[in-house]
């Protein structure tokens, strides 16, 4: 302790000496200004400027000295009326957000002229619960203004100005200028008990937005395949996350329901089922119908001409051709919906056909505005890069429209009719350049206004265990239905291997099979960074150890079983808490470690929504499960005697178990997994 006092004294003395020298220099400058000729304007201006800088530096140093002398004293009372400390029944408090605002108050009071430095408060495990890491940045900002203040002095000044808030138990300077923060366990307990009483609430959102999420997008008359898997799973999870945060989300399925392929399908339908207008044709196997029509289209020139003729008649909305088109679309929709029902996906269909009239209205406006250029018979549109890269092809040389045209019309519809504040496209990473150009063109012509956020959420390829593109043994694309069926079969084998059929009813076993099957497929995708390719392996995803859905689902069911073993229902636990007969236990270090992990739920969601990287939410879920295991191994919730009779129930710990289950259930829900109470 004596060494620390001596160090502070030495620093204070050095700072005092520098202050005296600065005072002398200021006085000398005053004299120079006084003695200079009135005509020497440039010199006078320079001297005044230097004088102002020295005065500023003097004031900073005085504050630093005062801070150094008072760093171990009690923090001053400061107004924190703007900090989010008041509990809101609609939101779960974010400790990181509160600390960021509290430290922001302290920084602005300590260094009011430094306003362009981010306030960094991050979770910490080694040196406290959180750590303030902006002192170095503030020191650098001061140095740029000609003021030299060491980061440690900056940190001390900030700590001295920290508002007194019930959240912060202790804040102390360490190392070269870090501030380690310990939060109040009582404050943390109050947040977690609110979760028990009111359910898991979202963090505070400063602005609720209307968000359009475009995902899945299969093609009519073709089966969904593994290539649609990532878009569907990622898009659904993003939608769930944004809905939980309070945004108004519109899920759009931009299906391919228009184009040349319908000409050949209709022509083949007419030949194969000539009575299709009066008798509904048995075309459940659209994939076979498509293959047959495609083969004829490629090999038979007369059939090809008929197909093109059918396209023209369809585009002219001739009733017989519209009915044939609707028949084909309806069959496809039913097949798509079977997959969506199994995976718990909700979507509003908005196909290519929806935008036909909008494209017809859009193209003349783009031409009239001078945004299109003629290129070898085509009409193209360049982005903001002045003719570099690849332009959008808005009109083909034959006068037809393209996917680029429909994408532009689609974007306009979402801004002007859906009134979207944020538009998200979930497609493979290979389309990144296309969307970059699309967004540039849309901004250039005024379709995409300032203030509307657009994101292309790209993802990598699904690989087989041979690290090549995922295919069947015969080299064909893997059908999504077949993949789901295989998942159910393998999950059943896994459950029977563990003899779960002996303890679960038939309905419970079926629910467990589907929970594991669809959960492991989704989680294996979401737990990987979406920007990377990932290897699809049932063997790995069905393992019950490590960061897998199986491990997490088992962990959840075990947590749910603890209260049941103690004979306590959720209603009884909430009553005990609300009536003051029990409180959530956070005294043991393992209890507090789990509690801190659960308290980070709001900040994890806030981080995920910034870059829509859902693997971070999966990592957090796995952290909860492993931290719970540490707690459960160290802290007895139920104590039994040698005969297995319950001797003691630690209600405070069971309350902590219940909060853990609630938070895990909410994360499962956002990820689209369906846990079951018994497995």
Give the positions of each predicted feature.
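Non-catalytic interaction-recognition regions
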Residues: 2-189, 196-679
């Amino acid at each position: 302790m004596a060494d620390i006092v001596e160090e502070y004294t030495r620093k204070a003395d050095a700072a005092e000496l520098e202050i005296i020298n600065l005072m002398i220099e200021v006085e000398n400058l005053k004299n120079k200004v006084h003695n200079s000729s009135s005509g020497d304007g440039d010199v006078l201006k320079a001297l005044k400027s230097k004088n102002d800088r020295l005065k500023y530096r003097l004031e900073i140093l005085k504050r630093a000295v005062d801070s150094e002398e008072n760093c171990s004293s009690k923090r001053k009372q400061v107004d924190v009326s703007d900090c989010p400390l008041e509990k809101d029944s609609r939101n779960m408090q974010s400790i990181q957000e509160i600390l960021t605002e509290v430290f922001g108050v302290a920084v602005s009071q300590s260094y009011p002229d430094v306003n362009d430095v981010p306030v960094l408060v991050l979770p910490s495990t080694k040196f406290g619960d959180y750590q303030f890491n902006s002192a170095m940045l503030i020191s650098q900002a001061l140095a740029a203004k000609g003021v030299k203040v060491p980061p440690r002095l900056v940190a001390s000044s900030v700590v001295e100005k920290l508002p007194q808030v019930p959240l912060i138990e202790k804040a102390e300077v360490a190392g070269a200028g870090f501030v380690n923060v310990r939060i109040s366990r009582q404050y943390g307990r109050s947040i977690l008990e609110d979760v028990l009483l009111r359910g898991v609430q979202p963090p505070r959102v400063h602005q609720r937005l209307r968000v359009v999420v475009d995902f899945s997008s299969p093609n009519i008359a073709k089966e969904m395949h593994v290539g649609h898997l990532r878009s569907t799973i990622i898009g659904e999870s993003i939608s769930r996350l944004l809905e939980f945060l309070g945004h108004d989300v519109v899920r759009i399925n931009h299906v391919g329901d228009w184009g040349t392929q319908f000409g050949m399908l209709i022509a083949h339908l007419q030949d194969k089922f000539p009575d299709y207008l009066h008798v509904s044709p048995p075309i459940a196997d659209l994939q076979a119908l498509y293959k047959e029509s495609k083969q004829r289209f490629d090999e038979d020139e007369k059939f090809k001409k008929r197909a093109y003729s059918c396209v023209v008649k369809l585009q002219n909305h001739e009733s017989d051709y519209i009915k044939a088109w609707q028949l084909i679309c309806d069959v496809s929709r039913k097949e798509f919906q079977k997959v969506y029902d199994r995976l718990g996906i909700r979507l509003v269909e908005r196909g290519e056909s929806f935008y036909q009239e909008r494209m017809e209205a859009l193209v003349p406006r783009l031409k009239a505005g001078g945004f299109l250029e003629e290129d070898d018979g085509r009409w193209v549109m360049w982005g903001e890069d002045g003719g570099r890269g690849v332009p959008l092809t808005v009109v083909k040389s034959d006068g037809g429209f393209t996917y680029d045209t429909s994408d532009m019309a689609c974007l306009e519809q979402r801004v002007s009719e859906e009134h979207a504040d944020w538009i998200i496209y979930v497609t493979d990473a290979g389309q990144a350049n296309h969307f970059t150009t699309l967004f540039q063109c849309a901004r250039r012509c005024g379709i995409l206004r300032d203030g509307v956020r657009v994101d292309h959420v790209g993802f990598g390829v699904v690989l087989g265990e041979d690290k090549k593109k995922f295919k069947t043994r015969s080299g064909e694309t893997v059908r999504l239905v077949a993949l789901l069926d295989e998942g159910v079969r393998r999950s059943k084998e896994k459950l029977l291997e563990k003899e779960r059929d002996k303890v679960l009813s038939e309905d419970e076993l079926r629910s467990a099979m589907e929970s594991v099957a669809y959960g492991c497929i989704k989680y294996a995708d979401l737990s990987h960074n979406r920007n990377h390719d990932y290897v699809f392996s049932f063997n790995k995803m069905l393992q019950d150890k490590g960061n897998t859905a199986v491990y997490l689902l088992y962990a959840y069911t075990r947590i749910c079983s603890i209260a049941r073993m103690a004979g306590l229902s959720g209603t009884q636990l909430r009553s005990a808490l609300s009536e003051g007969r029990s409180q959530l236990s956070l005294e043991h270090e393992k209890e507090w470690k789990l509690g801190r992990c659960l308290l980070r739920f709001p900040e994890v969601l806030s981080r995920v929504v910034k870059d829509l990287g859902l693997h971070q939410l999966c990592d957090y879920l796995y952290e909860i499960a492993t931290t719970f295991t540490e707690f459960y191994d160290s802290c007895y919730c139920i104590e039994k005697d040698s005969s297995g009779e319950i001797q003691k129930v630690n209600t405070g710990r069971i309350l902590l178990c219940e909060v853990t289950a609630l938070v895990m259930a909410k994360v499962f829900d956002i990820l689209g997994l369906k846990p079951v109470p018994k497995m």
